[in-house]
């Protein structure tokens, strides 16, 4: 008898198989007991008939509790009405562990109740579907960059300096010295790009922002890319290619999950390059034309981003922000030094910024000047300045927030569902 994953049952019609998993749900009509079993790859209905199975097996099936772990043996047969189109005529059942009364029933529960039991909430079909799409996005990112000759170069999580100032950093004690949890691997990406040409890193990022919104996490994952001899336009094109590739990949490989999430995939099929673009200055004019009192030099908030992105209905690049509201390393536009060669990619449907990036300053003296303007200590960035002393070249990069991308693709209302164990302003457990 072969051990089979539920997702592969269609290949075993008429054969006897062994399924190992957990009881998701059950129902009984008196003479027949239906066991809905999950194994992480799908759901299958096990049918236990009292007359055929015998009194002992039927009684065991009737007494098993929700989320008990089990091993189920039986013959696979087609049944269009059953989950997945197949069911198992059960001939054997073994309880691995009889679960205690399960706290999460199939009825509706409040968000706080579920968040406190996130370690169990992820077992539900909806949450599992989201995590499967997340896995597909992570695999897709790696495939995309590897196919374009980018090298994976891991960046440190503990850093001695801040990438964009210390205001939103988690400070830790590093053997008596101040250190910080990384808010970006970008500075290190710039160093490895000078060695390897094209690089990317994939890891957790930490922001101590006092933000309690549906878009914000204290800990989230970013894929960050950096490439030597890449200018602003090269960078924009790479971002367009990446996002459209990932959307297309999920549409192709996660149809079942998107259907379970009831995602309107029609809103994703048109995500193809080139994406619309709007300069920061034009965006300010657009907002004012809609009756919003917005001054040039201010940074966009969530309502502004939503208004802009909904105007296009597609991901849109907002580019050439004022130099004073962007990071110290952003390269000023040679044609207008008041703005930088940077861009944010806004997702439609109110999901906000999913990518931030731009061309970096490659001139030593200008970078020093920018450090002073941002009140950052030059001595802490000597290693970073070295990159402009020894073979400096034009280079560009960006960071993509995995959870925001996932939330948009899945149509998730709150970003807490886009990561297995969210860390939010007032929640650190489980």
UniProtKB/Swiss-Prot annotation:
The answer to keyword Nucleotide-binding applying to this record is yes
UniProt entry keywords in alphabetical sequence = Aminoacyl-tRNA synthetase, ATP-binding, Cytoplasm, Ligase, Nucleotide-binding, Protein biosynthesis
A GO BP entry is: asparaginyl-tRNA aminoacylation
Q: What is this protein called?
A: Asparagine--tRNA ligase
Gene3D superfamilies linked: Bira Bifunctional Protein, Domain 2 (3.30.930.10), Nucleic acid-binding proteins (2.40.50.140)
NCBIfam families assigned to the protein according to its UniProt record, in alphabetical order: asnS, PRK03932.1, PRK05159.1
The UniProt entry, under CDD domains, shows:
AsnRS_cyto_like_N, AsxRS_core
Cellular component annotations (GO), alphabetically ordered: cytoplasm
- Might you give the EC number(s) for this enzyme? 6.1.1.22
- Describe its partners and assembly state: Homodimer.
**Which PANTHER family is this protein grouped with?**
ASPARAGINE--TRNA LIGASE, MITOCHONDRIAL-RELATED, ASPARTYL/LYSYL-TRNA SYNTHETASE
Q: List the disulfide bonds.
A: none
Tell me the compartments it is located in: Cytoplasm
Q: Which domain of life is it from?
A: Bacteria
The reaction(s) catalysed by this protein are: tRNA(Asn) + L-asparagine + ATP = L-asparaginyl-tRNA(Asn) + AMP + diphosphate + H(+)
The EC class name is ligase
Q: Which family does it belong to?
A: Belongs to the class-II aminoacyl-tRNA synthetase family.
Molecular function terms from GO = asparagine-tRNA ligase activity; ATP binding; catalytic activity, acting on a protein; nucleic acid binding; transferase activity
């Amino acid at each position: 008898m072969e051990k089979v994953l539920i997702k592969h049952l269609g290949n075993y019609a008429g054969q006897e198989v062994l399924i190992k998993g957990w009881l998701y749900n059950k129902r009984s009509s008196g003479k027949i007991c239906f066991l809905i079993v999950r194994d992480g790859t799908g759901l299958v209905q096990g049918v236990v008939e009292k007359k055929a199975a015998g009194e002992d097996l039927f009684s065991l099936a009737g007494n098993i509790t929700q989320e008990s772990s089990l091993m189920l043996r039986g013959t696979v047969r087609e049944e269009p009405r059953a989950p997945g189109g197949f069911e198992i005529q059960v001939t054997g059942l073994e309880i691995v562990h009889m679960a205690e009364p399960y706290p999460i029933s199939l009825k509706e529960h409040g968000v706080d109740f579920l968040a406190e039991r996130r370690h169990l909430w992820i077992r539900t079909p909806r949450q599992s579907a989201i995590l499967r799409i997340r896995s597909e996005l992570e695999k897709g990112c790696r495939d995309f960059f590897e196919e374009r000759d980018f090298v994976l170069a891991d960046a440190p999580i503990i850093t001695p300096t801040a990438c964009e100032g210390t205001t939103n950093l988690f400070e830790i004690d590093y053997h008596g010295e101040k250190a910080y949890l990384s808010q970006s691997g970008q500075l290190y990406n710039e160093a490895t790009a000078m060695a390897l040409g094209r690089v990317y890193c994939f890891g957790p990022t930490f922001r101590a922002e006092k933000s309690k919104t549906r878009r914000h996490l204290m800990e989230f994952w970013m894929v960050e890319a950096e490439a030597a001899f890449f200018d602003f336009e090269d960078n924009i094109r790479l971002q367009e290619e990446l996002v459209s590739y990932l959307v297309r990949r999920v549409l192709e490989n996660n149809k079942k999950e998107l259907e379970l999430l009831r995602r309107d995939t029609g809103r994703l099929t048109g995500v193809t390059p080139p994406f619309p673009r709007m300069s920061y200055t034009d965006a300010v004019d657009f907002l004012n034309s809609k009756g919003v009192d917005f001054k040039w030099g201010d940074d966009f908030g969530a309502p502004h981003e939503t208004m802009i992105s909904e105007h296009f209905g597609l991901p849109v690049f907002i580019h050439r922000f004022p130099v004073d509201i962007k990071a110290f390393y952003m390269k000023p536009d040679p044609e207008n030094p008041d703005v930088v060669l940077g861009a944010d990619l806004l997702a439609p449907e109110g999901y906000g910024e999913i990518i931030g990036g731009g061309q970096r300053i490659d001139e030593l003296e200008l970078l020093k000047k920018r450090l002073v303007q941002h009140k950052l200590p030059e001595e802490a960035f000597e290693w970073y300045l070295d990159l402009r002393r020894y073979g400096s070249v034009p280079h560009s990069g960006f960071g993509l927030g995995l959870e925001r991308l996932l939330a948009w693709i899945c149509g998730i209302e709150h970003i807490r569902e886009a990561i297995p164990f969210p860390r939010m302003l007032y929640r650190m457990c489980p």
